[in-house]
């Protein structure tokens, strides 16, 4: 944690990298656990998913970011990334995330699982499951001192995932 906390001027951290997963590299593709611990300790990053292709069979073009830029130009894309207007994905689309009255609403492409991760070790109704969910509503937990933030993790029926950036309350 000391090392992560000492990092400055970091645009984003890689939450998922396909080539680090099995069968190529021993199942270390997902770094969400360590990033969640960092967030719980007040060290916040924006999240990207990426594939630095090594030309293994099946490692290319599986993880990426979706950017909400004003136009399709390098300048606009970089501005959107710096402003945090992006999310990491392997397929599921996050159309909109809104926070109103301590309730998070996610509108997305059809998913079968939505998890609202936070600094709390437990939160009632954190995991939502169902077939083809396109709107998921999550009330902020008041367990303990209440949630300070959440991160949305979506999984579709094919096992593809999407990760939002941190949503602060």
What does each model-found stretch correspond to?
Residues 2-169:
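Charged catalytic cores and adjacent phosphate/nucleic-acid-binding surfaces used
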